[in-house]
């Protein structure tokens, strides 16, 4: 019985992680992030994998990116500024963590 419960719990956790990534992609689409960004390559703004690589050793990256996602920014990735986004602080943190999880 314990083995079955452990297996079900493990399967549930694995599925929860996948659902979370899908949820964050849906959030990025809903907030129009994907209009200027893609996961793999530069569109108007940098690709998310490039952003994750740039900040991989920065312990404060999630907080920094959450601020940029919410308030907008310019100069870090070229001439075109990123406009402020209509996201809550929680959504900005979730999106930042998701972007930084890209490999």
Feature-to-residue mapping (PLM):
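Sequence/structural segment immediately N-terminal to covalent heme-attachment motifs in c-type
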Residues: 22-39
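Axial heme c-ligation environment in periplasmic c-type cytochrome domains
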Residues: 35, 44-55, 68-98
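N-terminal export/targeting leaders of redox proteins
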Residues: 1-23, 103
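Domain-level signature for proteins that mediate thiol-based redox and metal-cofactor handling
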Residues: 18-19, 58, 62-63, 71
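Stable alpha-helical elements in mature extracytoplasmic
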Residues: 24, 61, 65, 91-92
């Amino acid at each position: 019985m314990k083995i079955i419960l452990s297996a079900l719990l493990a399967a549930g956790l694995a599925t929860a992680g996948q659902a979370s990534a899908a949820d964050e992609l849906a959030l990025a689409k809903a907030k129009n992030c994907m209009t200027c960004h893609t996961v793999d390559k530069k569109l108007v703004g940098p690709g998310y994998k490039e952003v994750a690589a740039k900040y991989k050793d920065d312990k404060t990256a999630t907080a920094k990116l959450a601020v940029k996602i919410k308030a907008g920014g310019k100069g870090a990735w070229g001439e075109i500024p990123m406009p402020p986004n209509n996201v809550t602080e929680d959504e900005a943190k979730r999106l930042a963590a998701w972007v930084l999880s890209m490999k």
